[in-house]
From Swiss-Prot:
This is Thylakoid lumenal 29 kDa protein, chloroplastic. It comes from the Eukaryota. Its main location: plastid. The keyword Ribosomal protein does not apply. The gene is CLEB3J9. InterPro entries: Ccp1-like, Haem_peroxidase, Haem_peroxidase_sf, Peroxidase_I. Keywords: Chloroplast, Oxidoreductase, Plastid, Thylakoid, Transit peptide. One of its GO terms (cellular component) is chloroplast thylakoid lumen. Its EC number is 1.-.-.-. The keyword Lyase does not apply. GO terms for molecular function: heme binding; peroxidase activity. It comes from Solanum lycopersicum.
């Protein structure tokens, strides 16, 4: 007869409990021991099989490896949390810098929106090139007819980038990220301005209204798309319409080429030129776009403006990720090591 009585307890002991996982780094699990008793007086029917022994040994060793791996998982999770915190802190500094820059130059908002749109909508699905890659920063691209008048917006971001990079511990911000986050800040500024207007110009009440009923919580997915790569050369010409001269059909065709439709074209009206009312009047001439223009105009008259703001955020988020492979470790850095020998107890 073969006794594996000690095997089962050893298996159970290797299953990590929550407390053992927590203390894994301090008390690493010890290898288990499998004891077997053998009696010589066995008949053929009761005789043990070598395969049974190997299975028991394999199970015990496997559970031991699982327990040991818990310490590694704990370290990996801790590193991930540190990186998330680093990226979040850096992103907060970026937003604060852009907020201050836009607040001091509110007239630049329409150009910031168009700059982000024109940088992103160069995406070509067939070749998987273009997109929000910061290529619009190159002089040969920013000087194209469709980008006329956007120099001031780019110059503002250049100055903001100097401030941001000076305070960065994880490397300079990419132009691709900078341009899209500037558009986010610009959009938020228009949302807050609308709330203030609804409160008769009272800044405090308007800000409170936006905090209570606004769409600020809808930016989560956009914020996670952080770590875009910069292009090293301008995107090909002919991919961006001149919005002030293009027909509605041309606009629809361009939006369709990047996976967007009449609904998204309507909600992006503020990105197509400095005069949103004039742009919407043109878009309303198209029967496919008209219902969406009317829907968003009605939404903007409400207190919360939910339909308009949420759909705009969703569309901006999609545009800002076209063709990009996001580096989710961008802007992270090794944490400073603490010399415990110098600590005063």
């Amino acid at each position: 007869m073969v006794s594996f009585a000690s095997t089962l307890p050893s298996l159970v002991s290797f299953i990590p409990s929550p407390s053992s996982i927590t203390n894994a780094s301090r008390n690493p699990p010890q290898p288990g021991m499998i004891c077997c008793k053998f009696r010589s007086e066995l008949n053929n029917e009761d005789r043990f099989h070598r395969r049974d022994i190997l299975q028991s040994v394999g199970a015990a060793v496997g559970m031991d490896l699982i327990a040991r791996s818990s310490a590694f998982i704990e370290v990996a999770n801790a590193a991930d949390l540190i990186q998330r915190r680093q990226r979040s802190d850096f992103q907060s500094k970026i937003k604060l810098t852009l907020y201050d820059a836009i607040k001091a130059n509110p007239d630049i908002i329409p150009s910031l929106l168009t700059l982000a749109l024109n940088d992103a909508i160069t995406y070509d699905k067939a070749t998987k090139t273009g997109g929000p890659n910061g290529s619009i920063r190159f002089s040969s691209e920013i000087s194209r007819p469709e980008n006329k008048g956007l120099d001031a917006a780019l110059n503002l971001l250049e100055e903001s980038k100097k401030v941001i990079d000076l305070d960065s511990k994880g490397g300079p911000i990419s132009y691709a990220d900078l341009i899209q986050f500037a558009a986010q800040s610009a959009v938020k500024s228009t949302f807050i301005a609308s709330a203030i207007s609804k409160c008769g110009g009272n800044v405090e009440k308007g800000t409170l209204l936006y905090s209570a009923y606004g769409s600020n919580g809808q930016w989560g997915q956009f914020d996670r798309i952080f770590g875009r790569s910069d292009a090293q050369e301008p995107d090909p010409e002919g991919r961006v319409p001149q919005w002030d001269k293009a027909s509605v059909q041309e606009m629809k065709d361009k939006f369709k080429a990047v996976g967007l439709g009449p609904r998204q074209l309507a909600v992006m009206s503020s990105f197509l030129g400095p005069d949103q009312a004039a742009t919407e009047a043109l878009l309303a001439s198209d029967p496919e776009v008209l219902p969406w223009i009317q829907k968003y105009q009605r939404s903007r008259e409400t207190v919360s403006r939910t339909d308009y703001e949420v759909d705009l955020i969703t569309t901006v988020t999609k545009l800002s990720s076209l063709g990009q492979v996001i580096n989710y470790e961008a802007y992270t850095y090794p944490p400073r090591k603490i010399d415990v020998t110098k600590l005063k107890l």
